[in-house]
UniProtKB/Swiss-Prot annotation:
Residues 254-288 are annotated as: Disordered. This is 4-amino-4-deoxyprephenate dehydrogenase. Belongs to the prephenate/arogenate dehydrogenase family. Pfam families: PDH_C (PF20463). Keywords: Antibiotic biosynthesis, Oxidoreductase. Pathway: Antibiotic biosynthesis. It comes from the Bacteria. InterPro entries: 6-PGluconate_DH-like_C_sf, NAD(P)-bd_dom_sf, PDH_C, Preph/Arog_dehydrog, Prephen_DH. Involved in chloramphenicol biosynthesis. Probably catalyzes the formation of 3-(4-aminophenyl)pyruvate from 4-amino-4-deoxyprephenate. It catalyses: 4-amino-4-deoxyprephenate + NAD(+) = 3-(4-aminophenyl)pyruvate + CO2 + NADH + H(+). It comes from Streptomyces venezuelae (strain ATCC 10712 / CBS 650.69 / DSM 40230 / JCM 4526 / NBRC 13096 / PD 04745).
Amino acid sequence: MSGFPRSVVVGGSGAVGGMFAGLLREAGSRTLVVDLVPPPGRPDACLVGDVTAPGPELAAALRDADLVLLAVHEDVALKAVAPVTRLMRPGALLADTLSVRTGMAAELAAHAPGVQHVGLNPMFAPAAGMTGRPVAAVVTRDGPGVTALLRLVEGGGGRPVRLTAEEHDRTTAATQALTHAVILSFGLALARLGVDVRALAATAPPPHQVLLALLARVLGGSPEVYGDIQRSNPRAASARRALAEALRSFAALIGDDPDRAEDPDRADDPDRTDNPGHPGGCDGAGNLDGVFEELRRLMGPELAAGQDHCQELFRTLHRTDDEGEKDR
């Protein structure tokens, strides 16, 4: 048994809500899916209702529920906190799947300080499956319901990782907002270079193949979802600024002049200050020594594990047991 004889999943017709609804049902919970619109061709698959203004049938379900899980957009979830928690019985658990935590923490403090609550943010696409994958868990108010739900996630193969609301938003600004910005900026740079992607794919060393694959994966997703991640996290703008500043620092380190457009015909011009032979030139390799040392310290004990992971990834790309590409 799931620990939740009766559960309500709001937004359960969507990918994330559907994943949790399935997990609850498999564990024996009587799970009611609530949505504004039923899935196409399945008018009886859910209770149609507005969780921000519950009608009589939805209100009754919320009163009886041992768990109410909000798998909806942040705006809807925040508006739902007050009306939903007023209906929930003592001891019931409120959960949500928001990708930003600080707003929900403030809303709960204002309207439902005594309600058990945990936020679950699956750090993967639901289609990939939960087995072995991390689920960020932010506990606002602990209790038996929180323990039961985290145990249910573990039983479904997930790996709950506990974070505070502040830690969550700071971490996901790097793991999601920064990562997506890097990948899409890489694609924009390719477009500006005017390169033939077919030629790239045919000649690319493993690191470039991985970046092309990541770009292709992101482009297979929803622009709305990726845009929402960039806009909703209060720390995402800082992550993008850090990326832009890091690229400017790297360019300066190598010897680029940001005020002068690159001219391929001047590559060997002895008067260029970024020419290694110029008295004021820049020895990029020498300057990179310090960068490499700094980043090796940043990686710490994860450096060796990351190198092993990358080697395994490259082997998978080439379907071989011996991958010799190391520096390119």
